Amino acid sequence: MSGKNNIISQLEAEQMTKEIPAFAPGDTVVVQVRVTEGNRERLQAFEGVVIGKRNRGMNSSFTVRKISYGVGVERTFQTYSKLIDSVSVKRRGDVRQAKLYYLRDLSGKAARIKEKLN
């Protein structure tokens, strides 16, 4: 059984070649997503706060939350998806929890996150 597991982990390691910057929950990130409309393809930026991260090798994902026209929008991205063109960190947030789901219940200034100062 371990031989098969080695093959799977080797194949996953080959596919996880994308360079993604280190970011954590609380950070504000800009995710450039490839969007296909008809036969055209363009990049769409999704900027928001990372409220959760799931580290599972090839199956890693992260959730980004933003407020768009007064409505909270959350989007979960597969970290190594081919639809993600790039991820850039705009600012580092200083939080103590791994999952920031409590931000869903907050609005306005209460939902702000303190910036990390180093």
UniProtKB/Swiss-Prot annotation:
One Pfam assignment: Ribosomal_L19
Keywords (A to Z) from UniProt: Ribonucleoprotein, Ribosomal protein
Matches recorded under InterPro entries: Ribosomal_bL19, Ribosomal_bL19_CS, Ribosomal_bL19_sf, Translation_prot_SH3-like_sf
Record's function text: This protein is located at the 30S-50S ribosomal subunit interface and may play a role in the structure and function of the aminoacyl-tRNA binding site.
Family: Belongs to the bacterial ribosomal protein bL19 family.
NCBIfam families with a match to the protein in the record: rplS_bact
Name the record gives this protein: Large ribosomal subunit protein bL19
Taxonomic lineage from the root: Bacteria, Pseudomonadati, Pseudomonadota, Gammaproteobacteria, Pseudomonadales
Gene: rplS
